[in-house]
Amino acid sequence: NNCPGDWLPMNGLCYKIFNELKAWEDAEMFCRKYKPGCHLASIHIYGESLEIAEYISDYHKGQAEVWIGLWDKKKDFSWEWTDRSCTDYLSWDKNQPDHYENKEFCVELVSLTGYRLWEDQVCESKNAFLCQCKF
């Protein structure tokens, strides 16, 4: 584990919640600029999902939802991760994703589900966000 103190180590990567509110694209750019190879977080198994949820519940200040790196770039329900990892696990909240009013193409962790489940959201919404890095 080479993660700095306030990062969550998991499966060879490090994760950190940033509490400043940003639109999805700005959050992804922030993660990328933080260090080469960083992105908004991708989640691939239920266990990771739970560990991340627990970490966010401990360290997230405020009520904002939390961006992760999943988005519908083509706007056709073909979800992809910004780190280009495979979309092999999805943890949608009920009746999600719904592209509500054909405006929701970015994915957030839902605070009401303890950050365990996901929903699509308007990409311009300002949220806290979860970066993933290798150190």
Curated annotation (Swiss-Prot):
Pfam families per UniProt: Lectin_C
Summary of the tissues where the protein is detected: Expressed by the venom gland.
Assigned keywords, A-Z: Calcium, Disulfide bond, Hemagglutinin, Lectin, Metal-binding, Secreted
Motif window: Galactose-binding: 96-98
Signal sequence residues: none
Residues of the C-type lectin domain: 10-132
PANTHER family noted in UniProt: MANNOSE, PHOSPHOLIPASE, LECTIN RECEPTOR RELATED (PTHR22803)
Name assigned to this protein: C-type lectin BPL
